[in-house]
Amino acid sequence: EMQRSLVGSEMCIRDRATFVQSLAQVGYETICIGGVNFFSKRNDIGRVFPGYFNKSYWLPTFGCTDKNSAANQVDFAVDKLEKYPADRKVFMYINFSAIHYPNCHYVEGKKKDDKESHAAALRYVDSQLPRLFEAFRRRSDTLVIALSDHGTCYGEDGYEYHCISHEKVYTVPYKHFILRK
């Protein structure tokens, strides 16, 4: 039963704590495919976000140190997606780890992460997305929301990486679009 926030309003408030749990409540299969260790379920912090989903997965081959992590994650996602009938609503969250450090292995001979290796990691992840998008297209029209969880410093103001308070870390790319069947 949806509760209306205002009479005549199209806005509703669910009685679940998170957006993901609310989608599950209205019939979505919710799937999380983790990349970084925050999704590993190996400790308390690694169980929090995956716990919001009906199904959550993490494998070492999805992690930051596996050069083929995005391909592994997309292969896994497509396999899982194809197990559901086309009329089953699916919300899938994928945490692509390839962009996180270390990403220097995406540039031959590079020993340290920098903007060049970060860009190469982004190109690598982007190269894997068409297979995932095609799997969703075969099902139905799909809303895609693509965003980062944080930015990264590569020497700006003397800072490296993202575990700091800096404008570059707070700058997060975002894009949404509809994939048509």
Say what each PLM segment does:
Residues 26-29, 86-89, 140-141:
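Loop/turn elements at helix/coil->beta-strand transitions in domains of secreted/extracellular proteins
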Residues 74-85, 107-148, 154-155, 175-181:
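A long, amphipathic alpha-helix that forms part
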Residues 36-40, 96-101, 150-153, 159-160, ...:
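Short, solvent-exposed loop/turn segments at secondary-structure junctions
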Residues 23, 32, 94, 129, ...:
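Generic structural signal for small/hydrophobic residues in well-ordered secondary structure
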Residues 1-13:
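Single conserved hydrophobic/aromatic residue that forms the stacking wall/gate
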Residues 36-88, 98:
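Formylglycine-dependent
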Residues 161-181:
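Substrate-binding rim/cap in mid-to-C-terminal beta-strand-loop elements of soluble/periplasmic
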Residues 32-34, 90-98, 119, 145-148:
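Short beta-strand segments
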